[in-house]
């Protein structure tokens, strides 16, 4: 019965759970709100698991499809489906939401119900964006998830939370308005349809028109990634966001922008993608190298990891726009970009949670305030070492898989581009291990550090689960690659066809 509606359950179950949690009201019922939020997040994650176990890895196209006429007068439909690209993001989102609920279990003491509800509702909206097969449905979910994210940062964030949340909202909203115009134009070209498949199957779009549409989509998605130079909102948002907000922001919401490239720009506008590919490659390399060096200069742990996220996402966009002979996408690079997004979801969430664990004890993100943490928190130090190594792209961790595949594609594309891309391994090791060394090792010079207690059972469980995912994907990436393989090959074949 439920197997035909798994995607609807993945969307509406977290939203319904969020509304139920919200109904618990005041903080006197905070224990009940936490339990309901955990049950809702766990149920939301469990309903996504059949999407992975029952997914046909040899079949292309959308699976678990659902279709209902929604607004017939405008030809807008409730159409859902996942392919090998989007299915992993739906599962990742549900998993990270469960981790976020556990992460805020004891830390959040005020407006607990509202906090938990915001994350659950946002999780459902994000799943809707990843599963939508109707462009207007995608747009509604894509924009709708900004509201709970805005509230999470604006209500539970740091001293400059209002500035950070408004900046995030304005950056993302301005780009999205242009995307709406592009969607309406494409609908006219299909005779009124908003189906994403119909957009992708438009036979002829002049190059100049493709370039205009590319600019409209690109601004919207590039801000979300975020790409250089429209990245400045992200460090502010991360610094001010609560730990759970940073976990979701880095692990999930950034992926929506990159997903937009895969779902809209590349298949709908292949000629414009080839035309602008050299510029995208340059911007991506700037993000990888320059932003990596900016991360080296940071003294705030959250800012350092925020800049490292921009650098890693630069690696993702690089892998998406490597065309062989200006015709065909590099298969290894494209699949590596998707693997990098999944890995970054695990690793970035873990890194921000580690910073949150230390902040809860010392109430400081300044690297200079720490030192010698391993002497008082040995279990925590061991976990953080694993995540630091994964962030640096160490083999046998998930961080290595996608980076290695993208570098393979980059070297095949151009040796110089491959060499520049490989610098991310050096820079990643430099800024991550520099932070780890100064925070974890050395003598205890701050008396407050000496009073810090090692991780409790809740924190240990979260870190152990995240560690298992990082090591599992690093040691056995084949199940992830197998899911992506056919959808990526279909996208490559589609993009190779000119629409001029």
Give, region by region, the residue ranges found by the protein language model.
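Transmembrane helix-loop-helix hairpins at membrane boundaries of multipass inner-membrane proteins
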Residues: 1-6, 20-117, 193, 197-200, ...
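Structural signature of hydrophobic alpha-helical transmembrane segments
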Residues: 2-13, 82-93, 135-148, 210-223, ...
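Central hydrophobic cores of alpha-helical transmembrane segments in multi-pass inner-membrane proteins
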Residues: 8-24, 38-51, 92-104, 122-124, ...
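Alpha-helical multi-pass transmembrane bundles of energy-transducing inner-membrane proteins
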Residues: 27-32, 117-121, 125-209, 294-364
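C-terminal ends of transmembrane helices
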Residues: 19-27, 97-109, 151-160, 225-239, ...
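Alpha-helical transmembrane segments of multipass membrane proteins
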Residues: 18-23, 49, 98-102, 124-128, ...
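Juxtamembrane/interfacial segments at transmembrane-helix boundaries in multi-pass membrane proteins
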Residues: 55-77, 176-232, 236, 261-279, ...
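Predominantly late transmembrane helices and immediately cytosolic-facing juxtamembrane segments
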Residues: 228, 348-352, 418-451
